[in-house]
């Protein structure tokens, strides 16, 4: 079964598949309109992020090291 979703900008039907280059948008135009709306802060995340735990420098360093080990496409700055 093929999944079809409405374009968030114009509501045109978009087939959700790997070959749909601009998904969930129907076109580059709709994708850029949406990006512009985010840049102008017409769209925003409505709630502040709640942080339950304060991370120490050591914890942040360990998380960064683990991330870099698992994501080989990132290069550490020299």
Swiss-Prot record:
UniProt remark on cofactor binding: Binds 1 zinc ion.
Gene Ontology biological process: regulation of DNA-templated transcription
Transmembrane spans: none
Gene3D superfamilies, alphabetized: Erythroid Transcription Factor GATA-1, subunit A
Binding site for Zn(2+): 7, 10, 26, 30
Disulfide bonds: none
GO molecular function: DNA topoisomerase type II (double strand cut, ATP-hydrolyzing) inhibitor activity; zinc ion binding
UniProt keywords, alphabetically: Metal-binding, Zinc
Cofactor: Zn(2+)
Function: Inhibits all the catalytic activities of DNA gyrase by preventing its interaction with DNA. Acts by binding directly to the C-terminal domain of GyrB, which probably disrupts DNA binding by the gyrase.
Similarity remark: Belongs to the DNA gyrase inhibitor YacG family.
Quaternary context: Interacts with GyrB.
Official protein name in the record: DNA gyrase inhibitor YacG
Provenance organism: Colwellia psychrerythraea (strain 34H / ATCC BAA-681) (Vibrio psychroerythus)
């Amino acid at each position: 079964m093929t999944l079809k979703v409405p374009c968030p900008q114009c509501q045109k039907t978009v087939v959700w598949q790997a070959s749909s280059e601009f998904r969930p948008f129907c076109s580059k135009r709709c994708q850029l309109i949406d990006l512009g709306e985010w840049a102008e802060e017409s769209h925003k995340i409505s709630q502040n992020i709640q942080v339950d735990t304060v991370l120490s420098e050591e914890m942040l360093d360990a998380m960064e090291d683990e991330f870099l080990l698992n994501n080989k496409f990132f290069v550490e700055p020299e």
